[in-house]
């Protein structure tokens, strides 16, 4: 899937009121993946719908089609190109298997390099705007884990 299209979908999921990581993952699973969730003409999905789910899906569609969402996705794409960052998302083969099992795992991950295969590793998933507490906690956690 084209990177900009994926970024638009991930942006819509993270910027639609009422949609968090857990509900985004549930919706993607229910509809058969991120692409199917955004296939608004999908007749097969009609049997899965009930009012609350369909209202959320329509809200996601509204956010997805907005100019603001498109601009956010373009900005992310430019950032990724400038920093040499790749993107993977929930449902892709290279999305970390153990992270997939977390109920509130992020729908998208930006990364440099490749994921180690068949190794135990620790990753810190964060935000670009962490709180002071979050920064300090992470710093202390990494300091404790580094010698291991």
Predicted regions and their residues:
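A short, Lys/Arg-enriched amphipathic alpha-helix followed by its capping loop at the start of a domain
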Residues: 144-148
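Short, positively charged patches
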Residues: 1-143
């Amino acid at each position: 899937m084209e990177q900009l299209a994926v970024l638009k979908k991930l942006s819509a999921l993270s910027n639609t009121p009422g949609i968090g990581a857990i509900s985004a993952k549930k919706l993607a699973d229910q509809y058969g993946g991120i692409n199917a969730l955004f296939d608004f003409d999908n007749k097969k999905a009609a049997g899965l719908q009930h009012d609350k789910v369909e209202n959320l899906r329509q809200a996601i569609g509204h956010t997805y089609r907005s100019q603001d969402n498109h601009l956010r996705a373009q900005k992310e794409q430019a950032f990724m190109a400038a920093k040499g960052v790749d993107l993977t998302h929930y449902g892709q083969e290279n999305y970390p298997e153990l992270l997939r099992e977390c109920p509130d795992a992020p729908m998208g991950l930006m990364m440099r390099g490749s994921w180690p295969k068949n190794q135990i590793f620790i990753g810190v998933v964060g935000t670009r705007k962490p709180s002071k507490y979050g920064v300090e906690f992470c710093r202390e956690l990494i300091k404790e884990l580094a010698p291991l």
